[in-house]
Amino acid sequence: MFEPVPDLNLEASVELGEVNIDQTTPMIKENIGFISRSRRLFAHRSKDDERKLALRFFLQRLYFLDHREIHYLFRCVDAVKDVTITKKNNIIVAPYIALLTIASKGCKLTETMIEAFFPELYNEHSKKFKFNSQVSIIQEKLGYQSGNYHVYDFEPYYSTVALAIRDEHSSGIFNIRQESYLVSSLSEITYRFYLINLKSDLVQWSASTGAVINQMVNTVLITVYEKLQLVIENDSQFICSLAVESELPIKLLKDRNELFTKFINELKKTSSFKISKRDKDTLLKYFT
């Protein structure tokens, strides 16, 4: 019934040469973060399936979560499959639910940690989809208690650090009992350091709560980390006079140094990991 058109009935053979991947160069402004132009990552799936697939895409960066915790987060996302949260930006709902769920277990991320593990959330500049706006919207939609994600409560941020340096044999989801003394010690140092800055009028009040917390936590983490490296190198000890009630567990930090280094290196890759020399010098006065 139909006859082939000669001009279109063509065959071609394509020969591919050798390509050396090591010699390729990235494009200008190319970055490792993924930003969906259409806000739909898996448009051919239902929004529920899309959230789960998006969660798998994002959670692979949280390398310190074990399989039980990942399974728990998937169940939390599955529990709200019938809830319409956003009309367009469906793919970022999953990581926000994960962040709020982890926060409900006592672990929060500073701005630098968010940039390190969820750069898409940190780099969102539109007012509608900014981090704090999305947190408020999702809290309201899911019936969570409304409130700011970043508050002057330092334990949750150091609990995330504890998650990252956990012993492989820890039992239970988000269990940091073995590292609880480290959380208490780092938190006490940060609270006292924050009060010192308040008394000296060194806190930048124009900055957001998240930015102030980020600066405090980053300063304490990098100072403790660098002192730890000197201790390991020289086989010595150090103490911090700000840790009055909970002394720093140096042995624990030495034992987990490899994991601690991996976590610190992830933070150092971010643009928000900026340490004030003045703050660091002030804090170092309390280390001997």
Curated annotation (Swiss-Prot):
Superkingdom of this entry's organism? Answer: Viruses
UniProt xrefs under InterPro entries: Pox_A8
What Pfam family is a match, any one?
Pox_A8
Question: Which terms are listed as keywords in the entry?
Answer: Activator, Early protein, Transcription, Transcription regulation
Report if keyword Nucleotide-binding is assigned. Answer: no
Q: What induces it?
A: Expressed in the early phase of the viral replicative cycle.
Stated family? Belongs to the orthopoxvirus OPG134 family.
Sum up the protein's function in the record's words. Answer: Acts with RNA polymerase to initiate transcription from intermediate gene promoters.
Q: Which proteins does it associate with, and in what oligomeric form?
A: Heterodimer of a 45 kDa (A23R) and a 32 kDa (A8R) subunit to form the virus intermediate transcription factor (VITF)-3.
Name of the protein in its database record: Intermediate transcription factor 3 small subunit
Task: Give the organism the record lists.
Answer: Variola virus (isolate Human/India/Ind3/1967)
Encoding gene (name): OPG134
